[in-house]
A protein has these predicted regions:
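Acyl-thioester C-C bond-transforming condensing/cleaving domain
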Residues: 1-3, 15-46, 61-65, 72-182
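Short polar catalytic/cofactor-binding loops
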Residues: 8-13
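Short glycine-rich phosphate-binding loop at a beta-alpha junction
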Residues: 47-55
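A glycine-/small-polar-enriched, mobile loop at the entrance of the PLP active site in fold-type I
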Residues: 54-62
Length: 182
C-alpha cells in the first residue's frame, strides 16, 4: 500500500515565555491543532484512526504521561491508542516516518502523525538535566560560534556538540551548504 499525507495543520509559531501560546498546556495545544486537522478531512472519523503518533522533544512535566494517548483522550478518541516518540527536534518527522512504515507493512490504514513542543511550559517540568562534562569543550565551541566572532562553521574532527539547539544546527548547515533564505 502507498502512504499519503491527506491533511496538515499546525499552531502559530510562538515566542517562548512571552508569546500568545505561553499559557496553553502542550496536551491542550495538540488537541486544538488536531481538531483543526480533522476538520479538513471530514470523511475521516476517529473510528478510522489506527494510532496517534505524537512526537515530543521533552516528554516530561506537562508533556509527560504519554502525551500521544493523553491528546487522544482529550479529543474524545478513547478507542484510539497513542504513543509518544522522542527524537528531540525531529520527533514529529519520525512520527511521519513511523506512520508511513506502518501503512506499508499493512499494520493499518490511517494514522495521525503529529508533534508538540511548548518551551514556555518547561518550567512545569522537563526531562533534560545536567549535561555530560565530556561535551563541555564542544558546547563552548558552539557558544563561541553563536557569538559570531569565529570563522565560518565547517565539519571538524572534534567531538560534536550533542546539545546544540536545532535552530543553531539549521544555521550551521545552511551556511555550510550555502542555502539562502530566499
Amino acid at each position: 500500500p502507498e502512504a499519503v499525507i491527506v491533511a496538515t495543520a499546525r499552531s502559530p509559531i510562538g515566542r517562548a515565555m512571552k508569546g500568545s501560546l505561553k499559557d496553553i498546556r502542550p496536551d491542550d495545544l495538540s488537541a486544538q491543532v488536531l481538531t483543526d486537522l480533522m476538520s479538513k478531512v471530514p470523511a475521516v472519523t476517529p473510528d478510522h484512526i489506527d494510532d496517534l503518533l505524537m512526537g515530543c522533544g521533552q516528554p516530561a512535566g506537562e508533556s509527560g504521561h504519554n502525551i500521544g494517548r493523553a491528546t487522544a483522550v482529550l479529543l474524545g478518541w478513547n478507542q484510539v491508542p497513542g504513543v509518544t516518540v522522542n527524537r528531540y527536534c525531529s520527533s514529529s518527522l519520525m512520527t511521519i516516518r513511523m506512520a508511513a512504515h506502518a501503512i506499508k507493512a499493512g499494520e493499518g490504514d490511517c494514522f495521525v502523525a503529529a508533534g508538540v513542543e511548548t518551551v514556555s511550559r518547561y518550567v512545569h517540568g522537563m526531562a533534560d538535566g545536567p549535561h555530560n562534562p565530556t561535551f563541555e569543550e564542544a558546547e563552548a565551541r558552539t557558544a563561541k560560534m553563536a557569538e559570531g566572532n569565529e570563522a565560518d562553521w565547517a565539519p571538524h574532527d572534534n567531538l560534536p556538540d550533542v546539545y546544540i539547539a536545532m535552530g543553531q544546527t539549521a544555521e550551521n548547515v545552511a551556511e555550510y551548504k550555502q542555502v539562502s533564505r530566499e
